[in-house]
Amino acid sequence: FTMIGRKGLDLKTWEQFNDPNIRISVDAGSSQDQVATRLCPKAQISRFKTADEAAAALMAGRVDAQCIVMMLSLTMTKKNPNLGNVIIPTPVFATTSNAGFRREADKTWRDYVNTWIEFNKGLGLIRSVIVKNMELVGISEADMAGITL
C-alpha cells in the first residue's frame, strides 16, 4: 500500500501518518480503507464512494494524502504529476491478489489453477506480465523503487 501525498508532505512511516493532524482519503470499504483504519487510527480518515472522489479530495486540498495500492498510485501520478508524490510508508504493508472459486467437492480445477500460478511465478511470468502492463501506461520498473515484484 502507498500514500499519494500532497506536494511538500514528507512523511515516511505509517506511524507518522498515524497523527490526528493528518487527513487521509480512501474509497469506503476498500482494502485501502481497511489498511488506513488499522494502521492510522489517530488520523482523520475521509471515506468516499470511489477512488476518484478520494483523489479529487487530495487535489482540492481537503486531505493530505490518499491511501491506495501501488499500481494505482503510480498510474495516477504518472497521468497527473500535480496530484502529489507516491510515498511507500514503512514498514512496507503489502496485499495479496486473490481469486475466488465456487466450493466444490472435486478440487481438481482449484488445485490446477493454484499449481499453474505457483509454476508461473517461479518462472517469472507473473512478474514480467506486471512489468509489461505497467510499461503500457508509461511506468518502468525503476518507478517501483523499494518494491520487489
Language-model-detected regions and their locations in the chain:
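Periplasmic-binding protein-like
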Residues: 1-7, 70, 74-117, 136-149
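Short, well-ordered beta-strand segments
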Residues: 4, 23-26, 66, 100
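Sec-exported extracytoplasmic/periplasmic mature domains
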Residues: 8, 22, 41-44, 59-63, ...
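Paired acidic/hydrophobic, glycine-rich loop segments that form the ligand-binding mouth/hinge
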Residues: 25, 64-69, 85-86
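Short helix-initiation/N-cap motifs at beta->coil->alpha
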Residues: 10-12, 46-60, 95
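Ligand-binding clefts/hinges and TM-proximal coupling segments of bilobed small-molecule sensing domains
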Residues: 31-48, 87, 117-149
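Flexible hinge/capping segments at coil-to-helix
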Residues: 5-23
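Short helices/loops that flank or line small-molecule/ion binding pockets
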Residues: 15-16, 38-39, 52-71, 79
